[in-house]
A protein has these predicted regions:
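A generic structural signal for short beta-strands and their flanking turns/coil linkers
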Residues: 27-29, 42, 49-51, 72-76, ...
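A short mixed-secondary-structure module that forms the rim of ligand-binding clefts
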Residues: 47-84
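A generic structural signal for nonpolar/aromatic side chains embedded in well-ordered alpha-helices
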Residues: 23, 69-70, 115
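An N-terminal domain-cap segment
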Residues: 2-43, 47
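Amphipathic alpha-helical interface surfaces
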Residues: 19, 62-66, 107-111
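Charged, gly/pro-rich active-site loop segments
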Residues: 2-8, 86-155
Length: 155
C-alpha cells in the first residue's frame, strides 16, 4: 500500500474530551474477551460515568458464553466506533480488567443509573421477563485510545 493511500485511511489521535464525549453518547460497542486463546467478541450496551465502564451481561436461555468466559480480573477490550463515511469515522478502544458488580451494593445502583443515563440496550433484551441471567460488570480502564478521521480524501 502506498504511503499516500495509507494516509487516506489512517486516523489521527482524538482529543481526550472527544473520547469522553463518544463514550458518554454512543452507549454500545463491541466487547472482546478471550477464552483459552480463542477470541470472543459481542455487541454490547454500556454506560460510562467518567471513570468506569459498566457492562450488562444479559442472557436468554440456560447458558451465556460471556458468563462462562469471564471471571474477576478478566481483561476485556471495548471498541466503540461511529462511521458516517469512508473518510469520516471515530474509534475508541478501552482495555482493562473486569470486576463484578454485586447486586446488593450501592455500586449496583450506580451501575443501573449509569446505564439508564447513557447506555443503549439491544432490541433483543427489551423484555426483562425473557431474561434468564443479568450480571453487572465494571471495566476499569487501563488503556484508552482514540483515533479519528474527519476529512475528505488526501489529494
Amino acid at each position: 500500500m502506498s504511503q499516500n493511500l495509507y494516509a487516506q485511511f489512517s486516523g489521527t489521535p482524538m482529543a481526550r474530551e472527544d473520547i469522553e464525549r463518544l463514550l458518554r453518547t454512543q452507549g454500545y460497542g463491541i466487547c472482546s474477551l478471550c477464552d483459552d486463546g480463542t477470541p470472543y467478541s459481542i455487541p454490547i450496551s454500556f454506560g460510562y460515568d467518567g471513570e468506569s465502564i459498566y457492562l450488562p451481561f444479559l442472557a436468554e436461555g440456560p447458558r451465556s458464553t460471556k458468563a462462562e468466559i469471564v471471571s474477576e480480573g478478566t481483561v476485556a477490550r471495548l471498541l466503540v466506533t461511529t462511521i458516517s463515511g469512508r473518510f469520516n469515522w471515530r474509534s475508541v478502544s478501552v482495555t482493562g480488567p473486569l470486576r463484578s458488580v454485586d447486586p446488593d451494593t450501592a455500586e449496583f445502583e450506580q451501575f443501573i443509573a449509569t446505564l439508564d443515563d447513557n447506555g443503549w440496550f439491544m432490541r433483543g433484551f427489551e423484555r426483562a421477563d425473557s431474561l434468564d441471567s443479568f450480571q453487572g460488570w465494571r471495566l476499569d480502564p487501563e488503556t484508552i485510545q482514540g483515533l479519528e478521521r474527519t476529512e475528505g480524501p488526501i489529494e
